[in-house]
Amino acid sequence: MKIGIIGAMEPEVAHLIAAMTNATSQTIAGIEFIAGTLAGKDVVVTRSGIGKVAASIATTLLIEKYAPDAVINTGSAGGFVDTLAIGDIVISSEVRHHDVDVTAFGYEIGQMAQQPAAFIPAAHLVEAANKAIAQLGEVKAIEGLICTGDSFICDPVRTQAMLKNFPTMAACEMEGAAIAQVCHQFGVPFVVIRSLSDNANNDSPVDFDSYIVKAGYHSALMVMLLLEQLK
């Protein structure tokens, strides 16, 4: 079994790369792909860069060049659930674009034309993530809707507008739905694992800078524990 792991930023993949053995690297289109062993599994880890286009390019290259059996998106996110604190984790129950609107043609808000409204992660990956929760210690983890858009959300007015469109949203970030859409088209199972770096409010820029390393570590820890659960 080979697992592809994608994070957007260095703090989101650094702990994973440091824990790998037998690592080899190649760079394609300016994106570094590091293949090796992690938690007893063959993995390929890459830092995609920020945003949906960067994530789509990296995911396509990962699938085409390495043919992973599954893809895990790891990293940070802004939180939308009062019961979660910075550093806690959201496991995707579904993933949607929050900044897509082609409702004029009969699609749901957030649904890209000719695509499903929601991208559903692989059940066996979600199950493995849930089994790993018990080993997280004080870090809390839940399943929930993760939404994606090409914006860093730090405006309470925009936050409320997003919640009006997606009232069950647990977290938002900038890559997950793009990765999920590419996986959907290639028929590759996926899951998104995100640790909260901020709470999508006025303090988000300060919180993000302060807590991105913590969020990256917690998300990476969750990914490694998930890998241990996979058979």
From Swiss-Prot:
GO terms for molecular function: adenosylhomocysteine nucleosidase activity; methylthioadenosine nucleosidase activity. It is an enzyme of class 3 (hydrolase). It holds the Pfam family PNP_UDP_1. Belongs to the PNP/UDP phosphorylase family. MtnN subfamily. It comes from the Bacteria. It catalyses: S-adenosyl-L-homocysteine + H2O = S-(5-deoxy-D-ribos-5-yl)-L-homocysteine + adenine; S-methyl-5'-thioadenosine + H2O = 5-(methylsulfanyl)-D-ribose + adenine; 5'-deoxyadenosine + H2O = 5-deoxy-D-ribose + adenine. One of its GO terms (biological process) is L-methionine salvage from methylthioadenosine. This is 5'-methylthioadenosine/S-adenosylhomocysteine nucleosidase. NCBIfam families: MTA_SAH-Nsdase (TIGR01704), PRK05584.1 (NF004079). Keywords: Amino-acid biosynthesis, Hydrolase, Methionine biosynthesis. Substrate binds at G78, I153, M174, E175.
